[in-house]
Amino acid sequence: MDQNNSIPPFQGLASPQGSLTPGINIFSPLMPYGTGLTPQPVQTTNSLSILEEQQRQQQQAQQSTSQQGNQGSGQTPQLFHPQTLTTAPLPGNTPLYPSPMTPMTPITPATPASESSGIVPQLQNIVSTVNLGCKLDLKTIALRARNAEYNPKRFAAVIMRIREPRTTALIFSSGKMVCTGAKSEEQSRLAARKYARVVQKLGFPAKFLDFKIQNMVGSCDVKFPIRLEGLVLTHQQFSSYEPELFPGLIYRMIKPRIVLLIFVSGKVVLTGAKVRAEIYEAFENIYPILKGFRKTT
């Protein structure tokens, strides 16, 4: 072959001075633009093998998950391993998160049938109401009746008292009357009839309608001192105790619906009953509780 027509092999890039520089096997950032040479990415067998290995691992993982799903299709999936969830604390260790306390449900204290206090509360006051069935002139009643007072600026009713039974009546212009102070149901009814007869003698067509006992108050003594602080702590849903405001503990019983005033001396006042039996039942319910908080000196 002719040497003039032969093309010498590429040895490098021409410098501005026309001399040859050593051959450059890879793309260099020093290569000037517009030379007509386009760099090509270098591919190695190692990079291809890594990609193939990753694809193969992904395929194996997908196959294994599909097989597990087919085998466990009839079972409930678990988000956590059953061994990682334990409810009992490890021996010797205190659980970090104590279980929340269950709110207390108000329960009426019950008394065992075999236990009896042997104490009978005494009735101290009975409040009853009656309708006289006619309109009344309170000024006329106050002027003509004995033991009657009327001050409309202070209270819009005539206050009348009798000695036997020793009671007090509140007489309103509408014809309604409230009788207080009796010690028994019979005394309350008798006193209300006497007040109605007084109004009749003054010239009013008074009747005796709808007599009803509205409230009964009883009291007793358990004969031992009581720790009121301990009682209010264990029966918070029933009781309230503010010694700076009132020296007694207020206990609101659910059944029967009675309010008890309990004092540290052992005295107990029961109020809110409609019949005498509710007073007795409420005291029998509270007595074993009071025995549990007996103050020992």
Swiss-Prot record:
- Any one cellular-component term (Gene Ontology): nucleus
Q: What CDD domains does this protein map onto?
A: TBP_eukaryotes
The record's account of how the chain is modified after translation: The N-terminal domain is extensively phosphorylated.
Biological process GO terms, please? DNA-templated transcription initiation; embryo development ending in birth or egg hatching; transcription by RNA polymerase II; transcription by RNA polymerase III
The keyword Transferase is assigned to this record: no
What InterPro entries does the database record attribute to this sequence?
TBP (IPR000814), TBP_CS (IPR030491), TBP_dom_sf (IPR012295), TBP_eukaryotic (IPR033710)
User: Where does the record place the region Disordered?
Assistant: 52-116
User: Which Pfam families does the annotation name?
Assistant: TBP
What is the protein's major site of localization?
nucleus
The annotated subunit structure for this chain is:
Belongs to the TFIID complex together with the TBP-associated factors (TAFs). Binds DNA as monomer.
The protein's job, in short, is: General transcription factor that functions at the core of the DNA-binding multiprotein factor TFIID. Binding of TFIID to the TATA box is the initial transcriptional step of the pre-initiation complex (PIC), playing a role in the activation of eukaryotic genes transcribed by RNA polymerase II. Members of the TBP family are differentially required to regulate transcription and development during early embryogenesis. Binds to the promoters of select genes.
Q: Which family does it belong to?
A: Belongs to the TBP family.
Instruction: Report the HAMAP family cross-referenced here.
Output: TATA_bind_prot_arch
Identification of the protein by name: TATA-box-binding protein
Organism in which the protein naturally occurs? Xenopus tropicalis
Taxonomic classification: Eukaryota, Metazoa, Chordata, Craniata, Vertebrata
Encoding gene, per UniProt annotation:
tbp
